[in-house]
């Protein structure tokens, strides 16, 4: 049986992927606490990568956790079959499918056959999390025409994109325009 790598509490840092109670987790925060009396400990906030739940745990100084066997891969988005989002490795042409939980927010930024490059976190070959590209270009399918001189709403208006996502755009942007959006913030950047 292969020996799994493990991390001691003094190696804990944000972003570290570890196993906790059989589940892959990512460390979000790690605080080293040395009380006046007693043993030092680490107060750790972890996100369960399967469920997305955040938990807080305390570990005695010197405790260790097994490393999670997590791989990040870049894959091209192909299509959604109604239930799963399908991706392909551009080198090996191997395909994988991600469910709604793994897709999270990324789903609203991806359009079928776009071949957008996505970053996918795999645990034992199963997608845990999909990150959309930082920037995407999508067409506006629905927005109100901007009324000249109407700046009461901060100079913006909602626009529905072809994927169903809604972003705020400037008044001069019209239906059928293609726009560049930052997927991390959901903000309009420019007309494309």
UniProtKB/Swiss-Prot annotation:
GO terms for cellular component: cytoplasm. It comes from the Bacteria. The keyword Signal does not apply. The keyword Protein biosynthesis applies. One of its GO terms (biological process) is peptide biosynthetic process. May be beta-lysylated on the epsilon-amino group of Lys-37 by the combined action of EpmA and EpmB, and then hydroxylated on the C5 position of the same residue by EpmC (if this protein is present). Lysylation is critical for the stimulatory effect of EF-P on peptide-bond formation. The lysylation moiety may extend toward the peptidyltransferase center and stabilize the terminal 3-CCA end of the tRNA. Hydroxylation of the C5 position on Lys-37 may allow additional potential stabilizing hydrogen-bond interactions with the P-tRNA. SMART domains: EFP (SM01185), Elong-fact-P_C (SM00841). InterPro entries: Elong-fact-P_C, NA-bd_OB-fold, Rib_uL2_dom2, Transl_elong_fac_P/YeiP, Transl_elong_KOW-like, Transl_elong_P/YeiP_cen, Transl_elongation_fac_P, Translation_prot_SH3-like_sf. Keywords: Cytoplasm, Elongation factor, Hydroxylation, Protein biosynthesis. The modification N6-(3,6-diaminohexanoyl)-5-hydroxylysine is found at residue 37. It is found in: Cytoplasm. Belongs to the elongation factor P family. PANTHER family: ELONGATION FACTOR P, ELONGATION FACTOR P (EF-P) FAMILY PROTEIN. Involved in peptide bond synthesis. Alleviates ribosome stalling that occurs when 3 or more consecutive Pro residues or the sequence PPG is present in a protein, possibly by augmenting the peptidyl transferase activity of the ribosome. Modification of Lys-37 is required for alleviation. This is Elongation factor P. It comes from Acinetobacter baylyi (strain ATCC 33305 / BD413 / ADP1). The lineage of its organism: Bacteria, Pseudomonadati, Pseudomonadota, Gammaproteobacteria, Moraxellales. The gene is efp.
